[in-house]
Swiss-Prot record:
<comment type="subunit">
    <text>Heterodimer of uba3 and nae1. The complex binds nedd8 and ube2m.</text>
</comment>
<keyword id="KW-0067">ATP-binding</keyword>
<dbReference type="InterPro" id="IPR045886">
    <property type="entry name" value="ThiF/MoeB/HesA"/>
</dbReference>
<dbReference type="Pfam" id="PF00899">
    <property type="entry name" value="ThiF"/>
</dbReference>
<dbReference type="InterPro" id="IPR030468">
    <property type="entry name" value="Uba3_N"/>
</dbReference>
<comment type="similarity">
    <text>Belongs to the ubiquitin-activating E1 family. UBA3 subfamily.</text>
</comment>
<dbReference type="GO" id="GO:0005737">
    <property type="term" value="C:cytoplasm"/>
</dbReference>
<feature type="binding site">
    <location>
        <begin position="80"/>
        <end position="104"/>
    </location>
    <ligand>
        <name>ATP</name>
    </ligand>
</feature>
<keyword id="KW-0833">Ubl conjugation pathway</keyword>
<comment type="function">
    <text>Regulatory subunit of the dimeric uba3-nae1 E1 enzyme. E1 activates nedd8 by first adenylating its C-terminal glycine residue with ATP, thereafter linking this residue to the side chain of the catalytic cysteine, yielding a nedd8-uba3 thioester and free AMP. E1 finally transfers nedd8 to the catalytic cysteine of ube2m.</text>
</comment>
<dbReference type="InterPro" id="IPR000594">
    <property type="entry name" value="ThiF_NAD_FAD-bd"/>
</dbReference>
<dbReference type="InterPro" id="IPR014929">
    <property type="entry name" value="E2-binding"/>
</dbReference>
<feature type="site" description="Determines specificity for NEDD8">
    <location>
        <position position="192"/>
    </location>
</feature>
<protein>
    <recommendedName>
        <fullName>NEDD8-activating enzyme E1 catalytic subunit</fullName>
        <ecNumber>6.2.1.64</ecNumber>
    </recommendedName>
</protein>
<comment type="pathway">
    <text>Protein modification; protein neddylation.</text>
</comment>
<dbReference type="InterPro" id="IPR023318">
    <property type="entry name" value="Ub_act_enz_dom_a_sf"/>
</dbReference>
<dbReference type="GO" id="GO:0019781">
    <property type="term" value="F:NEDD8 activating enzyme activity"/>
</dbReference>
Length: 442
């Protein structure tokens, strides 16, 4: 494909955009000042100043990239760690058969850059966690098209952390980076505008998402009973076990990599044989290791359009932006509903209060761990616990030294009424932690 001349725009390229930014309207923000021929500030902002980050270059991400580029945005970064699979081609329209096996971010960026005059999409084939805070500070707005709750929680927490509150308790407006979050599942979808520290954050509504099926860690480690326990053991402990030979770096485990998944399957199968458990299959291993979400091209198009409209409105002030959640259901016709998610008191990310958690004093730490990992408010994945300056249970290198604590009661571990337990988890970014106050029911 030939690259178009990016030195000038084609005549009439932005005629539809100009109809919005060159005249005011009933829904325009009070601060909106229409562009003039002598002072095209909004168009200059779109094309030169407003840098947008797109997270995800899959079904939703392809639509988002196309929409942003055709809306006048020229400085776009896209992050996606995945490679293109042949099953993506029916809906992820920026990819072709020759692209199978290549980076989604790199191919999508190259396609947009070659097709749309003047657009500069910079790809990054990596995890969002691989970028530091300074990288994210450069963007005017972030738009996420992710199918992972964990990743959405992480970027939400990071953007909340980037907000600076001065000594007077006031938020520094320049440190607010809005997050436009889109998600689809089959014929359903949602678009949401999150203003960190101002509106409710993603974590405030975490209990609206069904928690993933989880199992008690002590059961996985000591008394597995079903095939899923063996697969979870391979994920949680097999990858960390230095005595097990692996053809890859455990820190770089990728559930989309066939070689990595084959290793996981064989590891789980050996674990199952040890405990005389039948039923570990490659397909089941895939199902446990990753959640496969059905995708419909038309749903992606609708939600991407809604998300990009919000980005455009926010950057141009041409209309008030969404406050703050829109849901779509196309299962039996076309249905949309908009409402405001309220800030949740005691939110682990944007709240300031301790989270109160009630539990029986005789419960073991293992039971406590199981309760907080299955609680829809938190949906922890691999939590580590500290209280009174000591480690109660830790992941990683300190796992072996703290495992014995799992069978002890909270009182035996000297956790008293109203004591604070600090919980860190991979789902939370950086040094963010949940502070939990313990209340005993008996």
């Amino acid at each position: 494909m030939e690259t178009m001349d990016t030195s000038v725009d084609l005549p009439g390229r932005w005629i539809d955009i100009e109809k919005i930014i060159k005249r005011t309207g009933p829904f325009a923000s009070p601060s909106f000042e229409p562009d003039t021929k002598a002072s095209p500030n909004i168009m200059n902002g779109l094309q030169n100043d407003f840098k947008v980050l797109v997270i995800g270059a899959g079904g939703l991400g392809c639509e988002i990239l196309k929409n942003l580029a055709l809306s006048g945005f020229r400085n776009i970064d896209v992050i996606d760690m995945d490679t293109i699979d042949i099953s993506n081609l029916n809906r992820q329209f920026l990819f072709r058969r020759k692209d199978v096996g290549k980076s989604k971010a790199e191919v999508a960026a190259a396609f947009i850059n070659s097709r749309i005059t003047g657009c500069n999409v910079t790809p990054h084939k990596c995890r969002i966690q691989d970028k530091d805070e300074d990288y994210y500070r450069q963007f005017k707005i972030v738009i996420a098209g992710l199918d992972s709750i964990e990743a959405r929680r992480w970027i939400n927490g990071l953007l909340v952390n980037l907000v600076v509150v001065n000594d007077s308790g006031d938020i520094e407006p320049d440190t607010i980076i809005p997050l436009v979050d889109g998600g689809t599942e089959g014929f359903k979808g949602q678009a949401r505008v999150i203003l960190p520290k101002i509106s409710s954050c993603f974590e405030c509504s975490l209990d609206a998402f069904p928690p993933q099926v989880s199992y008690a860690i002590c059961t996985i480690a000591n008394t597995p009973r079903v095939p899923e326990h063996c697969i979870q053991w391979a994920l949680l402990f097999g990858l960390q076990d230095a005595t097990l030979e692996k053809p890859f770096d455990p820190k770089q485990f990728d559930n989309d990599n066939p070689d990595h998944m084959n290793w996981l399957f064989e590891c789980a199968k050996k674990r199952a044989e040890k405990f005389n458990i039948n039923g570990v299959t490659y397909k089941l291993t895939q199902g446990v290791a990753k959640n496969i979400i059905p995708a419909i091209a038309s749903t992606n198009a609708i939600i991407a359009a809604a998300c990009c409209n919000e980005v455009f409105k926010f950057c141009t002030d041409s209309s008030g932006y969404l406050n703050n959640y829109m849901m779509y259901n196309g299962l039996n016709g076309v249905y949309t509903f908009t409402f405001e998610y309220e800030i949740k008191e005691g939110c682990a990310v944007c709240g300031t209060n301790l989270v109160t958690f009630e539990i029986d004093k005789s419960n073991t730490l293992s039971t406590f761990l199981e309760k907080i990992t299955t609680d829809s408010r938190f949906q922890f994945k691999k939590p580590s616990l500290r209280s009174n300056g000591r480690n109660l249970y830790m992941q990683g290198l300190l796992h072996q030294s703290t495992v014995p604590n799992l069978e002890k009661t909270l009182s035996e571990l000297n956790v008293q009424e109203d004591d604070e337990i600090t919980i860190t988890d991979p789902a939370l970014p950086g040094n963010l932690a949940v502070r939990m106050r313990i209340k005993y029911t008996s």
